[in-house]
């Protein structure tokens, strides 16, 4: 039977700089929502020459299946990443968009004493100094090997959301970059794996918040 283990992953949000509080609601959105105008990929887990990424959903609810995303120790690469570069146009004028929540999942195998750290960092190219990172960790502190599909959703607090440029004219929301990285940690020869198995593959999806500007 195929199942997912839903985990908090000791999640934390790490902003690079404090942001002022603004009035906003995740139920607020422009009358005209943007449509994806371009998507590209980079990173060891989805190289631009052959990304092996399957995208589904519209800009409002994107999901990315990462078929070549794999970390393995001790006989492979302990860390792997995939960065999505996504741009959309057509939003109503006078709005800003920011990443609000991140969901990641995949198949995880950990020997006792091994752990998995994962990171999702987002920023807009128009203001690349402002970033926010969602970070989680899963250790295997038990006495047996862990082998399970895992999933985690983390919400970014309103004060830490990184906002894109204010829309006008073409309704360009900015070039959003979202980097997903995992790192396997061991203190010896333990086995660790994060990737796909027979019926699942690493994937990420996210949701947005909007505010007036």
Q: Each predicted region: which residue ranges?
A:
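Fungal secretory targeting signals
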Residues: 1-22
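N-terminal leader/pro-regions and domain N-caps
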Residues: 19-74
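Generic short beta-strand segments
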Residues: 61-71, 103-105, 179-184
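Extracellular-facing segments of soluble proteins and assemblies that are Gly/Ser/Thr-biased and enriched
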Residues: 76-128
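Extracellular and analogous surface-interaction loops
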Residues: 84-96, 164-170, 209-211
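Short helix-loop boundary/capping segments
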Residues: 110-164
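Internal, hydrophobic beta-strand segments that form the core of beta-sheet-rich folds
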Residues: 164-189
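Proprotein-processing/basic-patch segments
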Residues: 181-213
């Amino acid at each position: 039977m195929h199942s997912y283990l839903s985990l908090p992953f000791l999640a934390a949000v790490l902003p690079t700089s404090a942001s002022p509080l603004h009035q906003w609601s995740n139920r607020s959105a422009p009358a005209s929502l943007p449509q994806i105008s371009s998507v590209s990929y980079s990173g060891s887990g989805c190289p631009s020459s052959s990304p092996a990424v399957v995208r589904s959903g519209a800009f409002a609810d994107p999901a990315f299946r990462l078929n070549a995303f794999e970390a393995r120790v001790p006989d492979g690469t302990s860390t792997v990443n995939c960065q999505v570069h996504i741009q959309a146009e057509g939003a109503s004028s006078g709005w800003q968009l920011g990443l609000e929540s991140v969901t990641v999942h995949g198949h995880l195998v950990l020997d006792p004493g091994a752990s998995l750290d994962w990171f999702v960092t987002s920023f807009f190219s128009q203001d690349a100094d402002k970033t926010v990172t969602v970070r989680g960790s899963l250790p295997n502190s038990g006495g047996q090997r862990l082998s399970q599909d895992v999933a985690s959703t983390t919400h970014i607090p309103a004060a830490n959301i990184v906002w894109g440029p204010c829309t006008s004219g073409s309704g360009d929301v900015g070039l959003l970059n979202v980097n997903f990285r995992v790192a396997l940690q061991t203190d010896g020869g333990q086995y660790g794996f994060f990737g796909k198995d027979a019926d699942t593959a690493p994937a990420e999806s996210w949701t947005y918040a909007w505010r007036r500007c």
